[in-house]
């Protein structure tokens, strides 16, 4: 398929009175995330897949101020690379496409319905603690905490239990967001049941089968990361012996 030329003319794709429409949900999610400190200073982002369309928040804008008309829309499936090959069917001319786009696409290729990227301080801190305690190859692990029940065991495997050990892989940061894609996909292959990947000194990518699941899983993980930092201060182990 050739690239769509008049990307700015499909405004109907982001115009809806339905609060559950992706073009309305993404601004609402970003306002919510800003309140948590997850998308400060234009960082982070969110994307939703509906049928054969991908809706994505723009790059380099104040996330708490995003409006439906700021949303990019991609035809799906679409190539990750090169960026010029991506099939935009709506592209606000005054804004930049999200640098997270190929990483979001990696999650959608795994069957996700929504992918969230945050710059949570708690996520960053646990990546540093894991590096200090386990080295660069270590992953985040925690067990025997009630909130673990908010995380799936894997596709079609139900939710984790209180006595299960949650494992979240960590990848190294890169100078440019898009360059994280191959490492993210490698982590997805190594941990096929994961619904999240931490990025050291950067943040986290979380995805779910739909918007509600991605959001609640992101909330549960951030709770666990904050708890882990506080447990570390008290000398408490993350995984109960």
From Swiss-Prot:
Its EC number is 4.2.1.109. The keyword Zinc applies. Pfam families: Aldolase_II. Binds 1 zinc ion per subunit. The gene is MDE1. Its cofactor is Zn(2+). Zn(2+) binds at residues 117, 119, 202. It catalyses: 5-(methylsulfanyl)-D-ribulose 1-phosphate = 5-methylsulfanyl-2,3-dioxopentyl phosphate + H2O. InterPro entries: Aldolase_II/adducin_N, Aldolase_II/adducin_N_sf, MethylthioRu-1-P_deHdtase_MtnB, Salvage_MtnB_euk. Substrate binds at residue 100. Pathway: Amino-acid biosynthesis; L-methionine biosynthesis via salvage pathway; L-methionine from S-methyl-5-thio-alpha-D-ribose 1-phosphate: step 2/6. This is Methylthioribulose-1-phosphate dehydratase. Its main location: cytoplasm. One of its GO terms (biological process) is L-methionine salvage from methylthioadenosine.
